[in-house]
Structures are given as structure tokens and as C-alpha cells.
Amino acid sequence: MASSKNNTAKHVAIIMDGNGRWAIKNTLKISEGHKKGVSIVKDIVEESIRQKISSLTIYAFSYENWKRPKAEVTAIKKLVIDAINDQVPELKDQKVRLKFFGHTNKFGKKVVDKLRYAQNETHAKNSKLDLNVALGYGGKQDFVDIVKKISKNVVEKKIELKDIGENIIHDASSVPVKEIDLLIRTGGDKRISNFLLYQIAYSEIMFIDKYWPDFSKKDFLKCLEDFKKINRRFGKRNND
């Protein structure tokens, strides 16, 4: 199928899976796998800017990840703080706008304060890339929150039932982006793991066998090039 110049991915999401398995494979601590994963994010952010992608949404920590061993969760909390301290100055220079979403309050005041700092520091109006980071996020949990918010607004007569549509749902969601063009999952598993259930309704989905720490700019570019070759019909026929 011929590539279309207009068929470019502007809104990309990534399930960054495989940090732990990569660490075990290389006889390293799990925390070392997560650290390596952060360095890959930096590479993909740089390439996203170069490719003029509007938003990059990454699954850093799921709602279900709270079930992981306490030591691993503690290490991830520290990694979040360290990554912000290390990367925010560069992201600011790159005009990358950071946004965090999900049940972030569960991370505690120290982490939440650092997230707020990072968002404030990178809040550029003329941003080259929106980097949306899911922390403590789950798609089903987001649906529950949306229903509660909208129901409350209806009860308080702030909106009427007839007003409820896609825009109202988006406004009630914690997810900053409306629709995802391309979803990439590394690590070999072929599932979406409760990520952006509403926003990926018409996303193209690519499953990559490589673990996230082995994912490269070259791999990312191949995904973007493969996306260009896809005939996206959105339920229509080619001649519609």
C-alpha cells in the first residue's frame, strides 16, 4: 500500500513494557531496568520533536502496578523524583510541556509536589511536544471517575443529560489528549493493559517484541513509517 504524506501520526502513545524482564535477562536489579527505561524515554522524546509529533503519551505506572512488591514501588517513586530533577531543565530547553495524569495522590506529598513543580516549569505556550505521563492511571478507573464527575454535575444542574457528549466526557477525563493515532507496546505481550480505553477507539496498534530498554530511535521511526502505509478508514469504505 502506498504511503500517504498526510497519514502521519501526530498523537502517539506507548506502553513501555519489559523493564523488569530486561533487568532479569541481564542479571541486574529490577530498579536498573527502570533506570534504563528512563533513558529510552529521553531518546524517544528527542525523536518525537524531530518528527513533529504533537503529543507523546507514555504509560509509566499503572493503577494495577500498586500490587507490585513494596521495594519496587519505592524505587519507582525515587526514580520519578530523580528523573524530574535530571530532565526538567533539558525538557524546558526543548520546549516540551509535561503533564501527569492518573491517581497521582497515592504517590505521597513529596512526589506530588515534584510533579507539580515539573508541570509548572515546563508550561510553555509554544511547546514543541506535549509529553503526557500516566502515573497511577487505569482506563477503567478513569471511566468510574468520569461517571462520578458527570453525575455530580447533572445532580447539581450544571449540565443537562442532553449536553453529554464526547467533549463533556473528555473534559471529565484525566487524560489530556482526546484521540490517539498510534499505540505502541513493547515487551512482546499483545494486550492494552487498561490503558487509554476511550482514547484508542480508532488507534492503530503495534506490538513490538523488544523489551522497552532495547527499543531504539530506529524502532520508533519504523513504527511511524509503518503507520504512514496504513489505510485508515474509520469505519468507512475507500470510495466513501
Question: Predicted segment positions?
Answer:
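Flexible, compositionally biased loop and terminal segments
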Residues: M1-D240
